[in-house]
Amino acid sequence: MTHYAISDLLKNKAEIGSEVTVKGWVRSRRDSKAGVSFIHVHDGSCFDAIQAVVAKELPNYDADVLRLTTGCSLIVTGTLVESPGQGQSCEIQATSVELVGLVDDPETYPVAKKRHTFEFLRGVAHLRPRTNAFGAVTRVRTTLSHAVHHFFYEQGFQWINTPILTASDCEGAGELFRVSTLDMANLPKTDSGKIDYSKDFFGKETFLTVSGQLNVEAYCLAMSKVYTFGPTFRAENSNTSRHLAEFWMIEPEIAFADLNDDADLAERFLKHMFKVVLDERSDDMAFFAERINPDVVSRLENMVDKEFVRIDYSEAIKILQNCGKKFEYPVQWGLDLQSEHERYLAETHVGAPVIVMNYPKEIKAFYMRLNDDDKTVAAMDVLAPGIGEIIGGSQREDRLDVLDARIGDMHHKEELWWYRDLRRYGSVPHAGFGLGFERLIAYVTGMENVRDVIPFPRTPDNAQF
């Protein structure tokens, strides 16, 4: 006998009439008066379960089969036959059902066969992948992860594993998780009474990374095209549907490139991501369109088909000021765009993805290249209909004197000595962007809370599991 993934059986990768084995969990069991049980078996390989038809003549029918409830694990062997019912091409006429694991108390099983709120399921995050929604999210997340690496590999990028432990604050926001092996009950102090981090494991104050960008720039200026894809951390005390304390970031960097090259890369990247998920996960996307957001498929198709429209920040401000719409947040040159402004531009004004470029220097990071007007930097945000900003990027400041002036009071130059070295030895124009992976998954699936697109969310007051 051959063990098959259920997805392979439903894709007709086994011949009708052949003997097959599937291993998985019970989604449901229905018994007929004629002494036949219909068991829907799921193994996580695809959205659909496969039906196993079990006759009462099976030796362990009364002892095992009639004890099966939602969540029980089992191994089914039988003959693959064409399904006489609608909705599935094949089913299994079982010749053997092996009960592997029972659910102790079916009445209190937290994810029994009924619909639960996502808030409830966050409290049982160890069991929620057994539900339709979180199984689908997991498969989409996997598909997108593979698509990230495939896209960059095909484009000639090198994958750089940037450090999780760092002494740098790339964003300058100060929202850092400190890492220490010091005895909290007996902290060493300096003469001035401050904590003496020279006695710590790394000999200095150390944090969890907020971004791999600064590190990946170093490799960009040797390898030309690089990217990092890994976990990042923000100690931002924010309990919103858009924030996580631990999340994954995709950060490519390209040498000999300006802001337009960066925008081109971002557009190609997003189109590839969305096309892959539409092609490979149509079953899961159909579920999201039916149960989560009816627009998820059409808006991804829109992102794939339509050219991204580029608008200068100053032009965007004029559009918003003259559109006649009353916004909650003020629209003024020098202020950052809020989500409501971004969505108006993408959804109402353009009706397509928008890339806003050249933002005021005061609202952007020190490493972004100062434009000739001395007022703006070569920064961009990619705005997607239905969510607003999905990518943020910039051309990097490659001139040491300008970089030093931009660093100013935000950072200590001595801490960034190695980053400044990159401008001293063979500096070139280069650019890159950052994309929060969970925000991408939320956009693709229509899930409204990023806590529901990562296996075990880390948020303020929550590090369970």
Swiss-Prot record:
One of the record's GO molecular function terms: asparagine-tRNA ligase activity
Listed GO biological process terms: asparaginyl-tRNA aminoacylation
CDD domains: AsxRS_core, EcAsnRS_like_N
Enzyme class: ligase
A cellular component annotation (GO) from this entry: cytoplasm
Keyword terms: Aminoacyl-tRNA synthetase, ATP-binding, Cytoplasm, Ligase, Nucleotide-binding, Protein biosynthesis
Reactions this protein catalyses: tRNA(Asn) + L-asparagine + ATP = L-asparaginyl-tRNA(Asn) + AMP + diphosphate + H(+)
Matching InterPro entries: Aa-tRNA-synt_II, aa-tRNA-synth_II, aa-tRNA-synth_II/BPL/LPL, Asn-tRNA-ligase, Asp/Asn-tRNA-synth_IIb, NA-bd_OB-fold, NA-bd_OB_tRNA
EC number: 6.1.1.22
Recorded coiled-coil stretches: none
Domain of life from the UniProt record: Bacteria
Primary subcellular site in the record, as a coarse category: cytoplasm
Subcellular localization, as worded in the UniProt entry: Cytoplasm
Subunit structure: Homodimer.
Family: Belongs to the class-II aminoacyl-tRNA synthetase family.
Name of the protein in its database record: Asparagine--tRNA ligase
Organism, scientific name: Hahella chejuensis (strain KCTC 2396)
Organism taxonomic ancestry: Bacteria, Pseudomonadati, Pseudomonadota, Gammaproteobacteria, Oceanospirillales
